[in-house]
Amino acid sequence: MASEIFGIAAVFWVLIPVGLAGGALLLKLQGD
C-alpha cells in the first residue's frame, strides 16, 4: 500500500508543475 501512495505522490509532483507551466504558456500565447 505504501508503494502505491508514493507512486501517486510522485505522479502529482510531476503533473502539477507541468500543468501550471502549460497553463502559463497558454495564457502567454493568448495574450499575444
From Swiss-Prot:
Pfam families: PetM. Keywords: Electron transport, Membrane, Photosynthesis, Thylakoid, Transmembrane, Transmembrane helix, Transport. Belongs to the PetM family. The 4 large subunits of the cytochrome b6-f complex are cytochrome b6, subunit IV (17 kDa polypeptide, PetD), cytochrome f and the Rieske protein, while the 4 small subunits are PetG, PetL, PetM and PetN. The complex functions as a dimer. The chain crosses the membrane at residues 9-27. This is Cytochrome b6-f complex subunit 7. The gene is petM. It is found in: Cellular thylakoid membrane. It is a single-pass membrane protein. HAMAP family: Cytb6_f_PetM.
